Amino acid sequence: MYALKRELWCVLLLCGAICTSPSQETHRRLRRGVRSYRVTCRDEKTQMIYQQHQSWLRPLLRGNRVEHCWCNDGQTQCHSVPVKSCSEPRCFNGGTCLQAIYFSDFVCQCPVGFIGRQCEIDARATCYEDQGITYRGTWSTTESGAECVNWNTSGLASMPYNGRRPDAVKLGLGNHNYCRNPDKDSKPWCYIFKAEKYSPDFCSTPACTKEKEECYTGKGLDYRGTRSLTMSGAFCLPWNSLVLMGKIYTAWNSNAQTLGLGKHNYCRNPDGDTQPWCHVLKDHKLTWEYCDLPQCVTCGLRQYKEPQFRIKGGLYADITSHPWQAAIFVKNRRSPGERFLCGGILISSCWVLSAAHCFQERFPPHHVRVVLGRTYRLVPGEEEQAFEVEKYIVHKEFDDDTYDNDIALLQLKSDSLTCAQESDAVRTVCLPEANLQLPDWTECELSGYGKHEASSPFYSERLKEAHVRLYPSSRCTSKHLFNKTITNNMLCAGDTRSGGDNANLHDACQGDSGGPLVCMKGNHMTLVGVISWGLGCGQKDVPGVYTKVTNYLNWIRDNTRP
């Protein structure tokens, strides 16, 4: 009888259809305490597990067709279906999205090196960095030698981390059994089935070897590297050299071990000087010199805190997640006090970047104040730093009609050569390289104290963050923005998640102007855009428009030179 049904089914699919013989293995597991068998199918081509009667597409491209498969009594049955390009991006890492013409399923055609339903798995990753939170490789063996269980396994439904969580893709979980670290543990792990129960186990995934970075942070008090050359090119003397007898900082100092001194000639900063130094002989005379040692790049680093509260247009955030965010205030003209004006971006100790349109009223510089390190817009923070403004520079070619060249610089006032002091709440963002090219649909972040929605009469009381994707230039045109002028100095980004008109789409809004659009480059957050303008807030398929920072690197450099 089954054979007859099978034959009839194939006849019905003769018009361009392809019948795939069910050669996949049937997996049956008795769930304890339940008198029924869970029937699943494993797709041998993708290694994904599917439940009884579940259907899916798989990327077996034949012209403009893919295969539509479903799980029937433990066997995978497939036939080809026509597809079209997806109406919205759903694939990561440059994958091509194809959607079935007659139903809503989609499939991603992944570039070389990436696999997974949405190309979210990096098959080339052979080790994990730091704690492995961003590890997306394919290691699936634990330290005990056990094989990891698929995160989609029904037995994990009651576990805190499984492949069916709403944020599964973000955490790296899904229909696979690869090691992950979704809870920010010390290293990647997975669930295993042992002694009739599921339990977590650390994976044997190798950690990436870290090259010792020859640079110093702060004043270099903790520098323990091996650099031994000074700025003049002289070689350092060993700290235990007899020539140093009578000097305070030598290998014979009672605190030598704590200070990093010993039987070596490596640069150190035992006395709290401005940077590491060492003793040298110059013209047969004993002296000292600063070392030829660069300061570590700390721009774009942060202590990211996972947002706990979702609000209209984004998520509430802590300033330590966006320590380059500035709040710009201006004195009221006809009443005492000040009002919030715009956002800004700390790009160096004494310079803040913002949007030109924020300063169309040409306020006197001494009426403007910049606050750094503040989570709540109007409530002083414990680590905040406030500055008066020496001057601000609006781009000479700013067009207040089209918002072309919508960029401005503010110089912070200080009695010394430095202004903002680096901390967890205050840090510069990295400026991009001139040739920076990020892939289309790269996920980036913006932050600001702006309104939750366009109709709101109030700005947000707390800093917000939003997650958006970079639009390709072909989708950042006047045609896609109701015939508004788009120039080469602008870029577009928006929330591309599916949903109806009432979906909570992330976006910038009034009051966020001048704030940052940042993307991860390496392990540093890099500034790619300045929040400029948009049509409404959080409208589906309507991106926000940002000033393209790479076009202004020379302008920034020329105007911030001492």
From Swiss-Prot:
Keyword Ribosomal protein assigned: no
Positions glycosylated per UniProt: T96, N152, N483
Site feature: Important for binding to LRP1: Y102
Annotated CDD domains: EGF_CA, FN1, KR, Tryp_SPc
Region (Important for binding to annexin A2) location: 42-52
Disulphide-bonded residues: C41-C71, C69-C78, C86-C97, C91-C108, C110-C119, C127-C208, C148-C190, C179-C203, C215-C296, C236-C278, C267-C291, C299-C430, C342-C358, C350-C419, C444-C519, C476-C492, C509-C537
InterPro entries, per the entry: EGF-like_dom, Fibronectin_type1, Kringle, Kringle-like, Kringle_CS, Kringle_sf, Peptidase_S1_PA, Peptidase_S1_PA_chymotrypsin
GO-annotated molecular function: serine-type endopeptidase activity
Reaction catalysed by this enzyme: Specific cleavage of Arg-|-Val bond in plasminogen to form plasmin
Residues at the active site: H357 (charge relay system), D406 (charge relay system), S513 (charge relay system)
Gene3D superfamilies: Complement Module, domain 1, Laminin, Plasminogen Kringle 4, Trypsin-like serine proteases
Predominant place of localization: secreted
The protein's role, per its UniProt record: Converts the abundant, but inactive, zymogen plasminogen to plasmin by hydrolyzing a single Arg-Val bond in plasminogen. By controlling plasmin-mediated proteolysis, it plays an important role in tissue remodeling and degradation, in cell migration and many other physiopathological events. During oocyte activation, plays a role in cortical granule reaction in the zona reaction, which contributes to the block to polyspermy.
Subunit structure: Heterodimer of chain A and chain B held by a disulfide bond. Binds to fibrin with high affinity. This interaction leads to an increase in the catalytic efficiency of the enzyme due to an increase in affinity for plasminogen. Similarly, binding to heparin increases the activation of plasminogen. Binds to annexin A2, cytokeratin-8, fibronectin and laminin. Binds to mannose receptor and the low-density lipoprotein receptor-related protein (LRP1); these proteins are involved in TPA clearance. Binds LRP1B; binding is followed by internalization and degradation. Forms heterodimer with SERPINA5.
Description of its domains: Both FN1 and one of the kringle domains are required for binding to fibrin. Both FN1 and EGF-like domains are important for binding to LRP1.
Name the UniProt record assigns to this protein: Tissue-type plasminogen activator
GN (gene name): PLAT
